[in-house]
Amino acid sequence: LVDVATSISRVALGTWERTELTLPEAASAHVVAASPLAGDEFWVAASSFTTPTTLLRGDASGALTEAKRAPAHFDTSGLETRQHWVTSADGTRLPYFITGDFSLGARPTLVGGYGGFEVSLTPAFSNVRGIAWLEQGNFYVQPNLRGGGEFGPEWHSQVVKTNRHKVWEDHKAVLEDVVARGYATPAQIAIRGGSNGGLLT
């Protein structure tokens, strides 16, 4: 992960020259198939907040070509994902993603969150979220709170036990930034979470 988005690089044998492969913007991706016995071909599955799971074919050149894509059951045109960084109460900087149609001004905004058990919240496509929320012209925010695994074990350990309150401070910093940037008013914001995220909200 590089700033919570997947980075995949090709390394040339012998020279060890590294070339980063071009993935969808703000994507989660992983290599799903590769075998030196089958040649230099490999396959990558990638998705983002606005792109459903896509199967990409790669080879030794480093180029990726789309082979197949899962259907999107809502209109993604006009939708964009941005990443912003905020500063929490103790000075720690953390990122969040916001997805929506930024031409519409302040809109109802749903903010998620988890911040626990070293679980990394990476970009992911959801038809349910798209149909029920994004297609209606609203914003969705995914914060990468401490307690998760986005930046390694220390990102998790910073907020355990007596420091647990810092997760709420992280979340508060994100909410304040959403308002400061004009994406939503306080009255337009709702927060949600499940499991550990339910304790957060």
Protein language model regions, located:
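Short, solvent-exposed loop/turn segments at conserved positions within beta-propeller repeat blades
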Residues: 1-6, 48-51
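Beta-strand-connecting loop/turn residues
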Residues: 4-6, 16, 40
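Short, solvent-exposed hinge/capping segments at secondary-structure junctions
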Residues: 8-10
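Short loop/turn segments that connect beta-strands within beta-propeller blades
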Residues: 12-16, 59-61
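A short beta-strand motif characteristic of beta-propeller blades
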Residues: 17-23
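Predominantly soluble domains enriched in secretory-pathway, periplasmic, or organellar proteins
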Residues: 25-29
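Serine-hydrolase catalytic core recognition
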Residues: 30-201
